[in-house]
Amino acid sequence: MSFDKQNLIWIDLEMTGLDPEKERIIEIATIVTDKNLNILAEGPVLAVHQSDELLNKMNDWCQKTHSENGLIERIKASKLTERAAELQTLDFLKKWVPKGASPICGNSIAQDKRFLVKYMPDLADYFHYRHLDVSTLKELAARWKPEILEGFKKENTHLALDDIRESIKELAYYREHFMKLD
């Protein structure tokens, strides 16, 4: 185990939709890497129970995607509240990274942060105020060197742990091919 302020916390949420005022968190996963993107540990992968009423209000894309990937079944079987999932995630992170040290890392991470602020505020407060958003590099590559985008393809399972693993691989790809740091 390597508790280090240089470690990076990667997080992904699946939600019932995109508006934190109306939608809720349905899955959370975390991974801790070292500063060079080597995976040190995978945190708990937690399906968060939500009511059938809320699940039935999800749009067609969410209904189809989360049915096909098995997440809806896991949500219905789960007894975990958002608070319980938040506490389990914090317990994991406290073993790896001091509070306030790591930026929140992921793809389109500002969206996840909006939900954390509303439904998991203690977890939101655990991060440094900065973001490490892989989608920023994707947007820059699309504008400055679009051919770079051809070399990395995502599977898009829309399961939180898979999405984090892909984000880490994607950043490593951009580091090597776009930023040319390797």
Swiss-Prot record:
- Where's it found, cell-wise? Cytoplasm
Q: What is its EC number?
A: 3.1.15.-
Pfam families xref list: RNase_T (PF00929)
Example of a GO cellular component annotation carried by this entry: cytoplasm
Give the intrachain disulfide bonds: none
Q: Where is the active site?
A: Y129
Alphabetically sorted, this entry's keywords are: Cytoplasm, Exonuclease, Hydrolase, Nuclease
The answer to whether UniProt assigns keyword Nuclease to this entry is yes
Question: Which segments constitute the Exonuclease domain?
Answer: 8-171
Q: Which InterPro entries match?
A: Exonuclease_RNaseT/DNA_pol3, Oligoribonuclease, RNaseH-like_sf, RNaseH_sf
Q: Which GO terms describe its biological process?
A: DNA metabolic process
The record's top EC class is hydrolase
Similarity comment: family membership? Belongs to the oligoribonuclease family.
General function of this protein: 3'-to-5' exoribonuclease specific for small oligoribonucleotides.
Name it. Oligoribonuclease
**Phylogenetic lineage:** Bacteria, Pseudomonadati, Pseudomonadota, Gammaproteobacteria, Pasteurellales
